[in-house]
Amino acid sequence: MNEYIMSDLYRCYGKKNFMTLCRGLIEDPGFNYMFWLRMCQRGGILKLIALPIHKWKRTFGKINIGYKCQIGYGFYIGHGGPCVVSDSAVIGNNCNISQFVTIGSNEGKSATIGNNVYIGPSVCINWRQCNYRSWCDSG
């Protein structure tokens, strides 16, 4: 199984097994969305299967993250969205985003978010470089 999917699963539930994967796909809209996004990024036949599912979820769901967006290991979407992340955004490892988050740009490339960042509810990031660590990690 894809290391990215397993790291997202571990970030959400603290476990990496088949039953937890099934639970995440059924119960957690954020993890379910990320599962299909990660499958789109794999390529091959899996991408052909996952692309229409991802497109449907992106169009009719509460989460809008393009499969071309670069997202590191251990990504977590709190409360199942809603959130919007531009295709050109880059998000580091072990990042959390909460509900009503928008990461994009009015022109050009979107923001680059560093590792171990928590983005709280209703935040809109429109800048190019946002390599700030979460406030709780700044110690």
Language model features by range: what are they?
Residues 66-67, 72-73, 78-87, 92-93, ...:
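Left-handed beta-helix
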Residues 1-62:
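Terminal amphipathic alpha-helical/low-complexity segments used for targeting or macromolecular assembly
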